[in-house]
UniProtKB/Swiss-Prot annotation:
Its cofactor is pyridoxal 5'-phosphate. It catalyses: L-histidinol phosphate + 2-oxoglutarate = 3-(imidazol-4-yl)-2-oxopropyl phosphate + L-glutamate. Belongs to the class-II pyridoxal-phosphate-dependent aminotransferase family. Histidinol-phosphate aminotransferase subfamily. This is Histidinol-phosphate aminotransferase. It comes from Francisella philomiragia subsp. philomiragia (strain ATCC 25017 / CCUG 19701 / FSC 153 / O#319-036). GO terms for molecular function: histidinol-phosphate transaminase activity; pyridoxal phosphate binding. Keywords: Amino-acid biosynthesis, Aminotransferase, Histidine biosynthesis, Pyridoxal phosphate, Transferase. InterPro entries: Aminotrans_II_pyridoxalP_BS, Aminotransferase_I/II_large, HisP_aminotrans, PyrdxlP-dep_Trfase, PyrdxlP-dep_Trfase_major, PyrdxlP-dep_Trfase_small. The modification N6-(pyridoxal phosphate)lysine is found at K216. It is an enzyme of class 2 (transferase). GO terms for biological process: L-histidine biosynthetic process. The lineage of its organism: Bacteria, Pseudomonadati, Pseudomonadota, Gammaproteobacteria, Thiotrichales. Pathway: Amino-acid biosynthesis; L-histidine biosynthesis; L-histidine from 5-phospho-alpha-D-ribose 1-diphosphate: step 7/9.
Length: 361
C-alpha cells in the first residue's frame, strides 16, 4: 500500500464550525454482545428477519463485499443512499454557507450544482469546448479554480459526453491541489471504460474522494446504493454527519444476494455486451444522414447531435431518450442510453426510418 504524501487536507478544510463536532451516538453504535436488547426502544417482537431491530449504521457484510469488489480496505468505504447522498455529505462537511465554492467542468452531472445550491455554496464551472472534443485542458482547469474552492468534481467517464479523464491527468490535478481542495472523482460509469479506477491511489493522495454506484453496470438503480471511497480519516468524518441508519436491512440483504459469484459473472458479461452494443450503435448512427455530430463514448450512452429535432418523434415510437437542450441550448442534441440487443435494434430501425424521411425533404 502506498503511503499518504499529504496529510493536511482532511482536518484543515473541514468547516470550522464542525471541527469539534460530536456525532449522534445511536443505540446500535454500542459495540457489545447481548441476548436481551432493551436500549433502542424497538419493538421486542422478533421475526426471522429481525426487522424489529435497527440495521447496522454501516452494514459490515455489505461493506466488506464492496471492499473486495473495489479492491480497497473496508475502512476506506462508506455506503450511502445513492451517490447523491455522498455528494451532499461532502458539501455539508467541507463548505461553509455563502463563503466557500465548488468547481466542475460542464456539461456534467447536474446534481453537483443542485447540492451546491442547497448548501448555499457558489458553484463555478469551466465550459468544455466542443472543438476540443470535450476534453479537459489541465492548465486551463487549474487556472480557473478559485482560491476559496473546497470541492472539485470530475466525472469520468463524463456524463453526458462519455469522455474519460486519463489517470495521469487526475494525478496531476491532485498534486497541484494538495492541501487546498478536495478532488471528487465520480466513477459512476467506470466499468464501461478502459481507464483504471483512481480508487487504486486513494492512499497516495489525501485529497482524493472516489464515488461509485451500483445503479449503472450493476443494474441496481432501484436499490439506491452509492459508495464513497477515500482515506479512513475522511470516512470517520463522513460517518459523523451521516444519518444513523441509512441502509435498510432489506436493501443490504437484496444487494448481497445480487453480488454473489454467479451474479457478478452475469454482470461482467452484461458489461461486455453493453460495450459491443455501444460500438454497434455508434457505427449505425455514423451511417445516418440525419446525424450531424457523433461523439465516441466510454460510458453506457452516446451523445448525438441530429440535423433536426427528433426527441418527440422517438417518443411517438415509444422510445424515450434524454434531451440535452439544457446543456447545449440545442434541442437536437440527445443522450441515448445503450439498451438490450432487441431495444437497440428497434431504436436503429426507427432512426433509419427518420433518416430516410429527412433525406427526402
Amino acid at each position: 500500500m502506498q503511503k499518504i504524501v499529504q496529510n493536511q487536507t482532511t482536518e484543515s478544510l473541514i468547516r470550522k464550525d464542525l471541527q469539534k463536532f460530536s456525532a449522534y451516538s445511536s443505540a446500535r453504535s454500542l459495540k457489545v454482545d447481548g441476548d436481551i436488547w432493551l436500549n433502542a426502544n424497538e419493538s421486542p417482537y422478533n421475526d426471522e428477519y429481525l426487522y424489529n431491530r435497527y440495521p447496522e449504521p454501516q452494514p459490515r457484510k455489505l461493506v466488506e463485499k464492496l471492499a473486495k469488489i473495489y479492491d480497497v480496505d473496508a475502512s476506506n468505504i462508506l455506503v450511502t443512499r445513492g451517490s447523491d447522498e455522498g455528494i451532499d455529505l461532502l458539501f455539508r462537511l467541507y463548505c461553509e454557507y455563502q463563503k466557500d465554492s465548488a468547481f466542475a467542468v460542464e456539461p456534467t452531472f447536474g446534481m453537483y450544482k443542485i447540492a451546491a445550491q442547497l448548501q448555499g455554496v457558489d458553484y463555478k464551472t469551466l465550459k468544455l469546448k466542443e472543438e476540443n472534443n470535450f476534453e479537459i485542458n489541465i492548465t486551463e482547469l487549474l487556472a480557473n479554480i478559485p482560491d476559496n474552492c473546497k470541492l472539485l468534481f470530475l466525472c469520468t467517464p463524463n456524463n453526458p459526453t462519455g469522455k474519460s479523464i486519463p489517470l495521469a491527468d487526475i494525478e496531476q490535478i491532485l498534486s497541484e491541489l494538495a492541501g487546498n481542495c478536495v478532488v471528487v472523482v465520480d466513477e459512476a460509469y467506470i466499468e464501461f471504460s478502459n481507464e483504471k479506477s483512481v480508487s487504486s491511489i486513494i492512499n497516495k493522495y489525501e485529497n482524493l474522494v472516489v464515488l461509485r454506484t451500483l445503479s449503472k453496470s450493476f443494474g441496481m438503480a432501484g436499490l439506491r446504493l452509492g459508495v464513497v471511497i477515500t482515506n479512513s480519516d475522511r470516512i470517520v468524518w463522513l460517518r459523523k454527519i451521516l444519518a444513523p441508519y441509512p441502509i435498510p436491512k432489506t436493501t443490504e440483504s437484496t444487494i448481497l444476494a445480487m453480488l454473489d459469484d454467479e451474479n457478478l459473472a452475469n454482470i461482467a458479461s452484461q458489461i461486455i455486451e453493453i460495450k459491443e452494443q455501444r460500438e454497434h450503435l455508434y457505427q449505425a448512427l455514423s451511417q445516418m444522414k440525419i446525424v450531424d455530430k457523433l461523439w465516441s463514448s466510454d460510458a453506457n450512452f452516446i451523445l448525438v447531435r441530429f440535423r433536426e429535432s427528433i426527441f418527440n418523434k422517438l417518443i411517438d415510437n415509444k422510445i424515450v431518450v434524454r434531451s440535452m437542450a439544457h446543456f447545449f441550448n440545442d434541442e437536437k442534441v440527445l443522450r441515448i442510453s445503450i439498451g438490450t440487443v432487441s431495444e437497440n435494434k428497434r431504436l436503429i430501425e426507427v432512426l433509419q426510418k427518420l433518416s430516410s424521411e429527412y433525406e427526402t425533404k
